[in-house]
Each structure stands twice: as C-alpha cells, then as structure tokens.
Amino acid sequence: CMVGEIRDLETAEIAIQAALTGHLLLSTIHTNSASGAIPRFLSMGVKPFLLAPALNAVIGQRLVRRVCNKCVEEEQITPEKLAKAKAILNKLPEAEKKNVDLNNLHFYHGQGCEECSGLGYKGRVGIYEIFTMNKEIEQVILSAQVSEYSIQELAVKGGMVTMAQDGLLKALE
C-alpha cells in the first residue's frame, strides 16, 4: 500500500491504521534525517502507542552531486577536513569500518570539462540512512521523551550508517 506524502494528522492516522492492520505501507514525510520522522509524527498529534508498533523502518535520503567521471582528479583536503572525515568514519558500525582504511583516505573533485559544462559535477547520487525499529526505540517512543537526537543515538547504536557516513563512503569510491 502506498500513501503520498504525510503532511497532516488525518493522513498520518489513516497510514498508521493501515500499517496496524498488517499492510506493508510505504510513504514519505519531510524531515532532515530518518530519526527526525518520529518527532515529526508526534508533533502532528499521532499517539505514541499507535506509532511505535506501526513502524518497521525509516529511511532518510538526499540527492547529492556526483563528481564528473571525465575530469575527476584526486583532491588534497585540509588537515581539519581530513580530521573531521576520520572522526565521522571512525563511528561507523564495525561491519562497515573494516572496509575503510582511515590512514589512507583519498578524496576527489572534478576540475571541469566539456562533458560537465565546466562544473566538475555530472548527475546525482543518493545518500541514505536506514534504521529499523527495535525495543529500545519503541520504548523511547512510548515514553514520550522523544527527540531527534535520542532516536539518532539509538539507531546508530543499533548499527545505522548515517547519511554523513554514507556520503563519505561514496566520496571515497
């Protein structure tokens, strides 16, 4: 079952009732991150005891520019940016971290060419974060002590790769 964007309480309640009756429901809601969806639903007036069992997973996504394949070249980044990238990547779940050599990071940029009209970028790529519901997140929702930060913290603890981490992983490819 597919519901267009959820913008109000009436649409949210219909979607939640469908999910609670066993239908797999896909929809969209505007937030800055996957963890922002839960506080957004609650701010609309959705009751926590209905929301918690209705959710299976939440996906956050953004489209970012892709470096042009024709004029790509390695970029030397500042020590500050490198330290920030390492700090973000160091927080990856262990399963993902084993694929990254933090001591050998290479970043790229496009210098601009005819193919990309001198921009250095051509096309877009999605960066994502996905968290699945677990008992801890459900308990936080039911306690009504919900913040985007608390949900994000629990999702990361449960193995979620954040959009920033996914973006850095894709930049390293």
Feature locations, PLM:
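Short, flexible helix-loop junctions that flank or precede catalytic/ligand sites
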Residues: 2-173
